[in-house]
Amino acid sequence: MARIAGVDLPRNKRVVIGLTYIYGIGNSTAQKILSEAGVSEDVRVRDLTADQEDKIRAVVDKYKVEGDLRREVSLNIKRLSEIGSYRGLRHRRHLPVRGQNTKNNARTRKGPAVSIAGKKK
């Protein structure tokens, strides 16, 4: 099993799909990484040679992925909250940040609906 950026890639999947298991690498970034490393997208993870793994590892190390990226995102959110911006306020209140309506929807962000006691007839 290939281990890249601290993540075990699934052996039976193609490399381009396996790379997307790393936080911060999507489909297009995985394709760029493989073209830069000179590895075919159709190769399965189990069929990678040690040399190909090292090339992919070297290219992935140039990107900010996994823990570093998670830390950066959380620090960005913390910074927005500390400076008192509107976006920071929305993050603190666990509401949608990008202007969505909250009258009817936004259940994912707000959590399960809480019933109001004493509303019975």
Curated annotation (Swiss-Prot):
A GO term, aspect molecular function: tRNA binding
Gene Ontology CC: one annotated term: cytosol
InterPro entries named in the record: Rbsml_uS13_C, Ribosomal_uS13, Ribosomal_uS13-like_H2TH, Ribosomal_uS13_bac-type, Ribosomal_uS13_CS
Keyword annotations: Ribonucleoprotein, Ribosomal protein, RNA-binding, rRNA-binding, tRNA-binding
Matching Gene3D superfamilies: 1.10.8.50, 30s ribosomal protein s13, domain 2
Biological process annotations from GO: translation
Taxonomy, superkingdom: Bacteria
Residues covered by region (Disordered): 93-121
Keyword RNA-binding: yes
SUPFAM superfamilies: S13-like H2TH domain (SSF46946)
Protein family membership: Belongs to the universal ribosomal protein uS13 family.
Subunit organization: Part of the 30S ribosomal subunit. Forms a loose heterodimer with protein S19. Forms two bridges to the 50S subunit in the 70S ribosome.
Role noted for this protein: Located at the top of the head of the 30S subunit, it contacts several helices of the 16S rRNA. In the 70S ribosome it contacts the 23S rRNA (bridge B1a) and protein L5 of the 50S subunit (bridge B1b), connecting the 2 subunits; these bridges are implicated in subunit movement. Contacts the tRNAs in the A and P-sites.
Name under which the protein is recorded: Small ribosomal subunit protein uS13
Name of the encoding gene: rpsM
